Amino acid sequence: MMKVLAVNVGVARPNPAKRADLTGIDKLPVDHAVQVRAPGPKHVGLHSGVVGDPIGDTKHHGGDDQAVYAYAREDYDWWEEELGRELPGGFFGENLTTTGIDVNGALIGEVWRIGDTLELQPTFGRIPCSTFQAKMGEPQWLKRFARENRTGAYLRVVTP
């Protein structure tokens, strides 16, 4: 059974990859409720589906099809073993750190229900970006991350 271990929200910081001036990839767990909404189109909408979560590169991130990003604790555990270092929830920039669900095997269009009313729908797996590469500092990280098919899932908001 799926469980949300943490809801993570970012803080706008200088982007180490310099693609955009700022990035919101640095996310930390919050201990309060957050509002989730459909943000609208990528280039003109509210960008993030999680209120208060900044997106620096709105050309490539955000919008309805990338409203929320989920990553599984089980995949973090696998990467910790591979990389030999600790990776806390939120480190990959996800809004939801989950357990008990194969996030990478999510079917596009299925509906995830969280809490009493929130419904999210997987849209596609993460395509890693240069900001993620810079944050990780691992050689060939983008290719390695994609090759291992442990990308997590982007989600659209069906019912806030």
Task: Describe the role of every protein-language-model region.
Residues 1-133:
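Electropositive, beta-rich accessory/interaction domains or terminal extensions
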Residues 153-160:
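Well-ordered alpha/beta subsegment
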